[in-house]
Amino acid sequence: MALLKVKNVAIRGISACVPEHIEENIDLPVFKEGEAERVIAQTKIERKHTVVDGITLMDLFEQAFEKLVSELQWERETIDAIVVVSNSFEYIVPASACVLQGKLNLSEDCHAFDIRQGCPGWVIGMSTLSSMMSTGFIKRAILFAGETTTLMNSPLDKETRPLFGDAGTATALEFDENATDLEFLHGTR
């Protein structure tokens, strides 16, 4: 395992957005009688938020971003970089981060790129972005992480459909020489 220690970067805030629509696991058409109850008892997951009616991951990211920068009172032109981490990209080309940069009216000088990762994505995105920021050339950045997993798996999938919902998050990072070190332990199994 690789231990990465990053200095001079602070987490200033985190905002999350989930879609309004709720899917009940008891109602999934894939289960035979009694199966849904067993899955719910084992996983403790009765329901999850899912996208419908054209809601996209970008929409969830945008709402999380607007709430976050409003609470932090950050001006858009002070954001130097954004990174989007997901397996649910809506675009192959251009990068989703570049599309989001335009949608959020961020500066054309704002560095924007994607990282394709699933479960460890937020940690990998945090370690990558904070490492870039630690020298002080990037003062403020936003890490977007999220999935619209229900668009990728079938309602007839017994393995993943009952487990994963949809959400988008925005995490604000800022260069700060007095910040507590961030530590990341990386490995792959």
Put a short name on every predicted segment:
Residues 11-12, 77-85, 111-114, 139-146, ...:
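Beta-strand segments within the central parallel beta-sheet cores of soluble alpha/beta enzyme folds
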Residues 134-167:
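Flexible, glycine-rich active-site loops centered on histidine and acidic residues
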Residues 64-80:
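Phosphate/pyrophosphate-binding loops at sites that engage ATP/ADP/AMP, CoA/4′-phosphopantetheine
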Residues 38-42, 46-59, 87-140:
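Conserved catalytic cysteine-centered active-site region
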Residues 75, 132-139, 174-181:
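Secondary-structure boundary elements
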Residues 17, 85-90, 117-120, 145-150:
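Acidic, glycine-rich active-site loops and adjacent beta-strand->loop/helix elements
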Residues 1-54, 157-189:
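Condensing-enzyme catalytic core mediating Claisen C-C bond formation in acyl metabolism
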